């Protein structure tokens, strides 16, 4: 581990320990009489207001892998990687049509999961079991992608091997088991605040060091002109559109997405959040452009792992302590 990586790793460890303490302390935050009821443990007592729900749902949807992989896609494959931005914009008008109704029915009948809803509405345990198993199977690769994002960050700091990832996942699982949904809700405050801080600093500092946005887009155009080009060719537009639309239709079918929705205290909380959550999409659009910034800066990934391009870019552009905050 280099000295630079050592400083970044030290700051990273500080924030990791901070969120670990917050995760275990979350059981006492907005404390109920007991967490042994599924409503309290799994949905935070269905008591989250607009502010908390905004951080929780945003933190659930815009994950570590999202912020690592989307710029990596733009770095490696030009415009196709930008699909994540329109799909996270289109999704909110779509779900505005049915999520408030889903919340009302679930609140009235005490449903905690999508499988509970299906069993209650269709009186079919086999169908509810299929929905539950589908959710579990769909979530497994989703979790794996988050671990890939963590691995990319650790690799940039010179930390190799599987044990650091296993330990981090084990600690996360432990405080989630202990505190229920209150843990990710409380941690989302810290995580998302750091994300917005990092984005604001990055889009100001990095372009100023690289000669402005004109130089950044010029470097991207120079790289991709011999190949697919910065703009999608006509043959790729249908695939781009269907990828974005399909992703939007699927996003709130994931169990963790529905959990954040059902934890809201009332329908109006959801309506306000559907209006405010696109702020995360704006942030994602700026983060995606980090891929083009890496091209302009001449940044190279570690080995063949394009997912490391953003962590490496931050190590090159910022002091080690700020890189640690970003990580």
Language model regions located:
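Helix-loop-helix module between adjacent transmembrane segments
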Residues: 82-179, 246-250
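Membrane-interface "cap" regions at the ends of multi-pass membrane proteins
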Residues: 1-67, 176-179, 198-202, 263, ...
